[in-house]
Amino acid sequence: MIIRLTVVCTRYNVTMEILCHKDTECVVSDETIEIKVASDKVRNKIKEFCRFTRVSVKEYPLVHKLVISRESKKVFAKTFNNR
């Protein structure tokens, strides 16, 4: 599975594509993006991307879930099946 995260700001757009296992879940709602991923490496990449783009992210380590807030900036997530 591939997760594409895009942050749209006034002067620039930042996009990151992450290759994940098939057991990864990504749920997009109006207020948050919830990514449930077991890999520490993938979680750290997502957290560093959010830190770079200054988007708030909450981590729930017991359930391996990251929650990205969509309120301050335009944050989009899209998933693709890896073939």
Where is each model-derived feature located?
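Thiolate-centered catalytic microenvironments shared by cysteine-dependent enzyme domains
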Residues: 1-83
